[in-house]
Each structure stands twice: as C-alpha cells, then as structure tokens.
Amino acid sequence: MVNQFDLNAARAAAERMVTLPPRLVIHGEPGIGKTTFGANAPGCVFIKTENGCDALGVPALPVEGVCETWDQVLQAFDAVLEAPEGVQWVVLDSLNGAHQLCRQYICDRDFNGVWTSKRGVEGYNAWAAGDKASSMEIKRLLAKADEVRAANIGIMMLGHTGLHKQGDACGADFYKFGMDMEPRSWNFVLQWADQVGHACREFTTGKRDGENRAKATMMNSDRWLVFDGGPSRDAKCRAGYDMPAKIILSFEEYQSKLKSPSAEVLRGQALNLIADSSDKVKDIIKSKLAASTAAEVKKQISTMSLQRVQTMVNWLIANNNAEG
C-alpha cells in the first residue's frame, strides 16, 4: 500500500500524471454561435436541453426531442460512459436548461411542486431552500461529467449570459456577466471548470451631439471568446489550460491555442500586448526588466517563468484597457 505522505511517491506520481481534456464552460448571448462552436469539436456528442443543434448534423442525446427531466440529463452522461468509443467531446447544450430541470426536480421532490410559500405550506422559494438543494444536485451533475472526462473525453457546457450582482467590500456593489442561472449553482460550476469563456461582440459607447444618453455601437462583426475575467465578466483559465485573453469564436482557433505550450502562448501574448502599448508602458517594461531595447525585452521574456509572464500579461491588459 502506498504511503500517501511519501514525498518520493509524490514525485513519481507527478511524472506519470497525464493532463485530462479540458472542462470548458461558455456563456454568451443567444445566437452568437456557441452551439456552432461545440458542433465543430471532433467526435462531439450533444446532450440537449434545447434544440439548437438539430440542423447541424451532430449526434445528440436524446435521439428525439430534448431532455425533459433532470434524470434524463444524468442518464445521457451515463449513456456516453457505456459507449465511449469515438467520443472526444460531450457538449451540454444548455447548462441553463439543465439547471431549470434541476430546479423543477427539487421543487417536485422536496416541496410537492409548490414554488411560492403559502400559509402553512413551505415552497421552493422559502428562505432560498430550493436553490440551496438545487446547487447540491448541480454538484452531482459535475461529478457525473468528471466520470466521463476520466475516459479522456472533453466536457463542454454551453449557456446563455445573464447578470450577477457582485458585492464589493471597498465600494458600491456592481453587476457582472456570467451564466444565467442561480448564483450558488453558478459558483460551483465556476470552481469546477478549467476554462470559462464569455462569447461576445465588441462594443463602444458614446453620446452624440444633443443626446442625453450614451448608446452602444458594435465595433465590427467579429465574435470573440474572452477568457480574461474581471469585474465585468466571469471568465478564467486554470493553470495548465491557459489560453490567450481572447480568441475568435471558432473551435479551430480554440484547438490551435489549446495545443500550444502554455508558456509559449503567454509569451507571444505578452509581446503582442507590449507592441500595442503606449511608449509610457513600453518604458515601464524596459525599466522593470533592466532592458534598453525591444530585442532585450523579448530575450528577457523568453526566459521568464510561466507565473511571471502571466502576471505581466494581466498587468498589460489592465493598463491597455485603462488607456484605451
């Protein structure tokens, strides 16, 4: 029996460790291309709670219609586990729909189908009891997805964007983009996922002469998948599953970046961000790296640790956004 606290055994286990496929979660507005993104994944099988993939010619469960109960969603994952040959990606479309089926399941199981409390009858919405129970069921879904992932199958969960109220200990509360689902359940998904991307377009806001309110104008027709999270959106990449701050919303683009070495992707991103920065920012970088030329900066970055490059990229993004 292996001593679980044997350092030599830990080193040997680390050398044998194989990186599993990513757990990718994407939230975005309806119609932006999330389902098309998933359908372009090789060896994909959809689990449907809505019929967005019907015209795309991809295998999907259930064969006809969509999952109508929470148990059917879990059963679909079991079906993949029973016949995993040829499956490279499982795509849940959508997580919002699965979450609503989960809530209905809890309401029927624990509250006899009563959503709103009445005199002497406690409903799903009483003291958030229903949502708390639902979040535990969402953890059950994530565990089921991990069983599939252990068979070397990537997990992709798609859903619609909503607004989540975020508390701020140092100022006024604010809203941020995230999956349109109950916050407790969404937080469990956020913690579980290796990558969370926000599918969106780029907008600019401004007031025209004589107008009192600013209007949003789409900058171009490009659709992006943003992995750089912050106060405005929930997005992230776990170490080992690093991606650029944003990529074109295309599975081919995603796959090409995913295959690149993490450090190489970050170093290239850092150099691109520096090239697009103001002279002031470039001077700060040169000073920090004790470099006098762009070539010396590039050489320094090529030998940096992954963590240090990531810190630089985050700083450059924040400064470029502030200046822009």
Question: Model-derived features: where do they sit?
Answer:
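Conserved nucleotide-sensing/catalytic segment adjacent to the nucleotide-binding pocket
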Residues: 54-116, 128
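Conserved GTP-binding G-domain of TRAFAC-class P-loop NTPases and closely related GTPase folds
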Residues: 166-273
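Conserved nucleotide-binding/hydrolysis micro-motifs of P-loop NTPases
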Residues: 44, 50-54, 95-97, 161-165, ...
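Short, well-ordered beta-strand core segments
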Residues: 44-46, 155, 196-198
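Walker A/P-loop
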Residues: 35
